[in-house]
Amino acid sequence: MIDFSLYLITDRNQTGGRPLLEVVEAALSGGVRAVQLREKDLTPAELYDLAWEMRALTSRYDARLLINERIDIALAVEADGVHLGVNSLPVTAARRIAPDLLIGYSSHSVGEAVAALAKGADFVTFGPVFPTPSKAAYGEPVGLGELERACRQAVGDLVFGLGGIKRDNLAQVTAAGCYRVALISDILAAPDPAEAAGAFRRGLGC
């Protein structure tokens, strides 16, 4: 069961020099209820240590923790789930290894989204919806029209819009029929992450 609508993805390079855990805690205090730990430049040992700290923090706020790609670390720290992508372990293999973990999947087309859910993913992120530096490698944004199509053709309630989503364009996302979003910078880089998280929750009606 996906019991969150605002999905925060970490990037400690976007916190303006503030400690990542401090910024994430502020976001949690503002209402974030799911965090994906995504720090790809860390060694496995460093990521493991940070994951334990993030697990303790999210547990205090009764929030979900998912680990990007590393199902071994997700299991080791008793995270709630793992987030996979096209170059990760296949969804079907992850489900065999960890039948009780939440599995998220990064999709960049309607076909990818539908296929991932059919293979056992619990939810998908879909994008990039708008231009964003963090998703430049995936080419041009898919746009709001494709997001709307993804929500119609996949199970709409299991699709999180991703990529360049900010408080000032959130209404366009919900108008496309998407009431779940994943994001990085508009919370992590905000002067007040708690206030930013609260604004997103209000905009999503959650």
Language-model segments: which ranges?
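A short acidic, helix-capping loop that chelates divalent metal ions and anchors anionic groups
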Residues: 37, 74, 130-136
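Conserved N-terminal beta1-alpha1 strand-loop-helix module at the mouth
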Residues: 1-91, 96-122, 149, 155-159, ...
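Active-site phosphate/pyrophosphate-handling residues
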Residues: 72, 145, 182
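Short, electropositive alpha-helical surface patch
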Residues: 174-186
